[in-house]
Amino acid sequence: MAIDEKSLEDFGKLRGKIDISRRGFLKNAGVVVAGAAGAAALAGCSSPKTASSDKSEGGSSANASSGASAYAGNEGKTMGEVLGAGWLGEEPEIAASDIAETKTCDIVVCGAGHAGTATARRAAEKGANVIVVETQTEADFAVLGNDIGHLNSSWQTERHGIPSYDVVDFMNEYQICGAGRVEPTLLSDFANRSGEAFDWFIDNFTEEEKAQIVPLNWPVPDGYDYKKGMFHSYVGTANFGEGVSLKDALIRSQDIAKEAGVEFLYETTGVKLVHNDDNTEVTGIICQQGDKYVEIDAKAVVLCCGDIGSNSEMYNAICAENYWLGEFTDCKAMSGRDGSGIAMAMRMGAKVEIGTGGDMGSHAAFPMSPLEACETIWLNKYGKRFCNEGLGGPLMSGCTPARQPGDILYSIWDADWKPMLLNQIAGHLALKYWDDDTINKIDGYMQAAEQAGKDGSDESGKYLYCADTIEELCDYMGMEEGVKKQVVAAVADWNAAIEAGADMKFGRDVNTMYPIIKAPFYGFAGSKRVGGGSLVSTSGLLVTGDQQVQGQGFEPIKGLYACGNTEGGRFPMGYNGIMNGVSIGMCLTLGYTLGEFLATGDLDEATTLGLNNAEPKQSDKGMPGPPPAA
């Protein structure tokens, strides 16, 4: 997701608790890593007694003598009670007499960002009565992002001639990136309908305004191969950096929603869900508006409240991998959202993402050289190659580097770097443009490094080295003699794999590997950046294919839905970067499909159908089941 500096500055003033600019976040980072985020210790999870923990002669147990409490277990508790112990808190007590006003509608949407606006507008266009509540003021409304990733829009295929992609290939590749944990219906809706949703979003644009939207990584270089091993390169993300900004485009969509009858209540914040005693049904939401409370009752409450970026305790708990990779450095994101929408649902028993959780990139590490995250040969602190650098883009192939010893990663390439760079997979943290201006700029960095000799050049903002031999290049980058020998051997093995036509060591498609044989040679040494945060977190509430929030027993909570960064199921193992702008693309598309469903679908089916199904018959001839409960 791209972030324009002005929107980030505005957004930080309004909502942020973290003063980080995009420029400051990326400046001289050298290596983008995973790292800052993860899971808080689970309540009650002290070490259980083992079979050998017999009582001492005095009768006290080993646990007691060591000061540890006996393990009590967490069975029957909600995820909020276990995962949120110590930080989630209780629902606020708001008496009926404190409610100054009550409104009624079909659908109430909490949040007017990309997902919330799409949900409200589409539902209203389909005949629903919709109210949107938004914390920000209307005058100072801000939103993040410049790019909308999608597939097969008429804007792509007809206006720009971008080839249509096979949605079946896309769904399978995306599911691999999510280790099989992506919610399949959400993925299907995006793959099959994101192009439709994008065309709908820009339908109000003039032809001139549509022409100002830039398709990233288009046109592709001559002879470009879209197939990269098991994966494809998805080009054509819509960039709103010129002409109408994405913020202004979103405000236009809000205006269209208002014309369709949607009521927007700005400076209004949802604070408590209205629900029954057993937490199985939501019938409204209580909001704070200035010094008063307003209750909005509806058939459907949709949480589009953003992520958990400024709430480190929640971030640490829900995004476990990032927290662990950062060795328990508190997680923070630039979004500034506080996770209040997710917390509201968790307090009444809702589940969150069941996976490692994640954010936009801090689960992965790679040498972020002047070639961006180019998938050259990657070497660790020992000078050894250690992974398939070309496995589905840097946010997937970068998972292994994040776990390597030390805090240095090296990248090396040779004089014929242009064909390599122009055949990289498109996506997050890769080059966005393959035009002559971009290549000439990078060529200038190479020339500066060649002239700089052993001191290297930081003309690109990152030190780049150039030498006539691999050994000399290693010396310039400050490697020990033993490490230098490993590098020479790794480069020789790399070239041999290309010659043999198979990378038998790590399985990389040799069509994505380029020889390192022609002088001069270039090298980059990056410091592995661990911890500190990311652009935005991408894990939220567990939802069904209809985006209905799930509670105990994985049953959907009647009347409660989530979309955008408040919902899970999209990036359960962290942001995949399969295309630029895929996060906002999902916000738009899934908001579009959710609004349509809420206005026209059967909202009772998920909580009524199947209640009287017969229990499965159990055979005594197969494998025995678990022992009966004590």
Task: Go through the PLM ranges and name each one.
Residues 296-365, 578-580, 584-593:
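Glycine-rich loop(s) and the adjacent beta-strand/alpha-helix scaffold that form part
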Residues 125-142:
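Glycine-rich FAD pyrophosphate-binding loop
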Residues 272, 484-574:
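A glycine-rich dinucleotide-binding beta-alpha-beta segment and adjacent secondary-structure elements
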Residues 103-105, 291-300:
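Core beta-strand elements of the Rossmann-like FAD/NAD(P) dinucleotide-binding domain
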Residues 71-74, 190-292, 312-313, 497-520, ...:
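Conserved redox-cofactor binding core of oxidoreductases
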Residues 342-344, 351-479:
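An anion/pyrophosphate-binding glycine-rich loop and adjacent beta-alpha core
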Residues 99-113:
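Beta1/beta-strand and adjacent pyrophosphate-binding region of the FAD-binding site
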Residues 1-24, 39:
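N-terminal secretory signal peptides
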